[in-house]
Amino acid sequence: MTQNIGKITQVISAVVDVKFTNNGKLPEILNALECYNDKQRIVLEVAQHIGDDTVRCIAMDSTEGLIRGLEVIDTGNPIRIPVGTETLGRIMNVVGEPIDGKGEIKSATISSIYKPAPDFINQSTERDILVTGIKVVDLLAPYAKGGKIGLFGGAGVGKTVLIMELINNVAKAHGGYTVFAGVGERTREGNDLYHEMIASGVINLEEPEKSKVALVYGQMNEPPGARARVALSGLTIAESFRDMNAGQDVLFFVDNIFRFTQAGSEVSALLGRIPSAVGYQPTLATDMGELQERITSTKHGSITSVQAIYVPADDLTDPAPSTSFAHLDATTVLSRQIAELGIYPAVDPLDSNSQVLDPMIVGEKHYGVARQVQQVLQTYKSLQDIIAILGMDELSEEDKLTVSRARKIQRFLSQPFHVAEVFTGVEGKFVNLDDTIEGFKGLVEGQYDDLPEAAFYMVGTIDEAVEKAKILKI
């Protein structure tokens, strides 16, 4: 079969026009085209057909050095990447090329990054809790195995640290494979994560096949085409792990889903599409749906996905984060007000929610304690205006007691993280679900009313708070 060869006619930023004149056959939409710039392979993805003989493409790499007249080859397929166990312990880019300097990824299977979502009949609906060891999450917005979890927050409130702690707590204890897709985030964080995984043994450099994680990066400095597709590349690897063996559980981390939307918006503008609300692409809901519908559990195995979602200007009604809400089973909202109090993780206990917080799934005791905790915190929130204007002395005795308990609960929701040990010097804590429930049950019932607030700050279990109180009294 003869190759379909075209020539570049125009390069504008990440958009490249290619003219095919030989046999009049235009490459299909989403086909990958290849050209070589100083021996470096550059992949272009067909986005539009213009006239009878020209296609408009989005480049997956820098277009610097591309010139008019350069030959372009139609591969006849969409972007395809290596999948399977050979990807474990490796870092690749959006088109499946290794970027860790460890040589070629020799996989027997290559797969297209575009796939249909599993049929309804093949999807699984079982619900189990995924214990994270983070008190505020496990108690108030528990995660479901095989569910979709969103971490919402503005700039600098701790989304990436929370994702790193989840990788530390869940991926290490988890028997299956993990895939991490770095979408448009800081290269430094990607590098730190890689070296942390090597140090903790999640990545085995000597025998990569014994590693537990595959990494796919399309960082902030990449062109929009790469950032718009790298989440699909990561998901393709996660799907291959899920479907490889029966009963295989896969963890899929994405940092950051907003950058996927942002890159889609850039691509849309470059292609000259009319923007929709707040300047986003008109296909925002479709793009998000195509990605999210593929992240699902089937009868073969499950994909549990944790997605960091940046909230522009802390506005949860922005179209990008609000489009994601509909697809999620649990939302963990990080709040700047709580971060300003010095409480980390800065999870908002009233804004965060989960479909799994149901007495039929978590049990009556867990559900009852969680709702009591939220009730105390909600009462405290409603009293804050009165306290600000009139002071604590004007409150009734009952309200004073509620405020005292709420402040202790607020501090007890903080927790030292393993991944932050380097910065804080405080040893990280993993708290079992039963200990979490017992601790908060004692707090709302007033068993610890005599202990000072400071005893509850940055501890693991309630026993540690009691010990800390004894030290504070000395």
Curated annotation (Swiss-Prot):
It comes from the Bacteria. Its EC number is 7.1.2.2. One of its GO terms (cellular component) is proton-transporting ATP synthase complex. ATP binds at residues 153-160. InterPro entries: AAA+_ATPase, ATP-synt_VA_C, ATP_synth_F1_bsu, ATPase_a/bsu_AS, ATPase_alpha/beta_chains, ATPase_F1/V1/A1_a/bsu_N, ATPase_F1/V1/A1_a/bsu_N_sf, ATPase_F1/V1/A1_a/bsu_nucl-bd. It is found in: Cell inner membrane. It is a peripheral membrane protein. It catalyses: ATP + H2O + 4 H(+)(in) = ADP + phosphate + 5 H(+)(out). Signal peptide: none annotated. SMART domains: AAA. One of its GO terms (molecular function) is ATP binding. The keyword Secreted does not apply. F-type ATPases have 2 components, CF(1) - the catalytic core - and CF(0) - the membrane proton channel. CF(1) has five subunits: alpha(3), beta(3), gamma(1), delta(1), epsilon(1). CF(0) has three main subunits: a(1), b(2) and c(9-12). The alpha and beta chains form an alternating ring which encloses part of the gamma chain. CF(1) is attached to CF(0) by a central stalk formed by the gamma and epsilon chains, while a peripheral stalk is formed by the delta and b chains. Produces ATP from ADP in the presence of a proton gradient across the membrane. The catalytic sites are hosted primarily by the beta subunits. Belongs to the ATPase alpha/beta chains family. This is ATP synthase subunit beta. It comes from Rickettsia prowazekii (strain Madrid E).
